[in-house]
UniProtKB/Swiss-Prot annotation:
It comes from Pholcus phalangioides. This is Protein hunchback. A zinc finger (C2H2-type) spans 1-5, 11-33, 39-50. The lineage of its organism: Eukaryota, Metazoa, Ecdysozoa, Arthropoda, Chelicerata. GO terms for cellular component: nucleus. SUPFAM superfamilies: beta-beta-alpha zinc fingers.
Length: 50
């Protein structure tokens, strides 16, 4: 919690310059580098990673 107050972002992406305060946000960010579209609409061709 204190990282939010001090602006510390120790979790860094190895593929770009993104950094964040907690590991769960980094895990979520890493999906942006993936080609896996986890959620697909059953009625059309729309798909998203998140």
């Amino acid at each position: 919690h204190l990282r939010n107050h001090f602006g510390s972002k120790p979790f860094k992406c190895g593929k770009c310059n993104y950094s964040c305060a907690n590991k769960s946000m980094l895990n979520s960010h890493m999906k942006s580098h993936s080609n896996i579209y986890q959620y697909r609409c059953a009625n059309c061709c729309y798909a998203t990673k998140y």
